[in-house]
């Protein structure tokens, strides 16, 4: 599944079983994107400030758990849940003060535990996690658009915004 954006640019997107992410360390001088394929790469990106801002960190962490699910080699649901829990703990260590990080990780944890406890198959759990990560990102984008719509009236037309 590819998560499409209508914008010409993006800060993060899911494409071909990987997370593509703008490297914020180089902004505004240049746009550089990373392609992350493992939950460890996601954790390192959060730690190295590739991604900044609590909501964005939460979104990225959610996709990190999707990568953990897709990369797990576990053959049964209990081992699969343990793999996801290990990834969740690793991601939680990346930014201990980022509230959205823990909120997103908890939200994803509820998804996999609910599905696994109902003995649903792994493929369905993976798809459910991906859908939840996409929903977390969509909610954040909607919130940002609303902030912009409400804030535009506060900026005089003659102002220059950096």
Language model regions located:
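N-terminal active-site beta-alpha-beta segment that forms phosphate/nucleotide-binding
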Residues: 50-162
